[in-house]
Amino acid sequence: LELLRASVSAAGHTLAAQRVEEGQKSIVVRRLCEESLTKFLTYLNPSKIMDSLMEFDRIVEQELGKSFSNPIRIRIIVHCGCALERAVTRTPLVYEDSKKDIDTQKLAAIQKAVKVFEDALKLHFSEDELYFMAKMI
């Protein structure tokens, strides 16, 4: 019984340490994305959209059942922030590759996650923007 308690306690500490490490990685990702978006965006304030962007990332990872590497997270979050600006300026990207080659599970995860922006910011992405995001992940 003592061995079981010690094992459970050690597992709990390991899990807690992993959560702290993940939290620190999220802070780093958030800061890097916010700094990048400050350079790229003209109309949107990155500090005001970061919560929505981080929630978008969380939902996509949850829907796909995987954790993205930090470089992929940064790329998708920055792309998404720029896509929000394109939604504001009504200058969406045009996806010219074959849409039937896109992973439908990834596209469905993106479609669910963008509801964050529709609800919080009343901004909608073009279908082509969604295809670009699905291709990125």
Feature map (PLM): residue ranges:
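A cross-family "folded-core" feature that marks the main globular domain of proteins
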Residues: 1-137
